[in-house]
């Protein structure tokens, strides 16, 4: 059981793990098995690696709508996700804790990727000057 999650019931958390496997369920959702998830307390003023650790688990299952995996899944891909700690009953009647995923924005990562593409494309022409700061304005 994921007992370390119990004190955080209904709390919002930040997570990182690796996609291990997935399957489409009868109800249309996708069960995505995340291996070695790291679960941390959120703090917008601290980088993820430096956040307070709640727990490191063996695995967590995420149940996602088809639109949430429209970009496809790749085995062993690192994934960041957010959610709320929830308690559920397993089919054998035992209780455990999991994470109900919530929407997550990776806009900052997309901006960084655009910046890198621009720098690489414009780097050969010294008349074209672009910085990370003026790209973000």
Question: Where are each of the predicted segments found?
Answer:
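Short intrinsically disordered terminal tails
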Residues: 1, 136-137
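OB-fold/S1-family single-stranded nucleic acid-binding modules
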Residues: 35-37, 84-136
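Structural detector for short beta-strands of small beta-barrel domains
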Residues: 7-41
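A generic structural signal for short beta-strands and their flanking turns/coil linkers
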Residues: 15, 30, 56-58, 77-79
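Transition segments tied to proteolytic processing and entry into folded domains
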Residues: 1-7
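Flexible glycine-rich surface loops and low-complexity tracts that mediate binding to linear polymers
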Residues: 17-20, 76-91
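Intrinsically disordered, low-complexity acidic/polar segments
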Residues: 26, 43, 90-92
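Beta-strand/loop nucleic-acid-binding surfaces
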Residues: 39-73
């Amino acid at each position: 059981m994921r007992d370390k999650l119990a004190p955080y019931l209904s709390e919002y958390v930040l997570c990182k793990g690796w996609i291990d496997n997935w399957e489409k369920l009868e109800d249309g959702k996708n069960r995505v098995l995340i291996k070695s998830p790291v679960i941390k307390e959120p703090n917008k003023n601290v980088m993820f690696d430096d956040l307070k650790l709640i727990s490191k688990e063996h695995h967590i299952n995420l149940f996602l709508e088809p639109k949430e995996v429209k970009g496809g899944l790749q085995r062993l891909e690192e994934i960041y996700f957010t959610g709320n700690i929830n308690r559920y009953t397993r089919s054998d009647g035992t209780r455990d804790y999991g994470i109900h995923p919530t929407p997550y924005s990776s806009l900052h990562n997309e901006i960084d990727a655009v910046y890198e593409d621009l720098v690489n494309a414009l780097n050969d022409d010294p008349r074209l000057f672009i910085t990370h700061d003026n790209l973000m304005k």
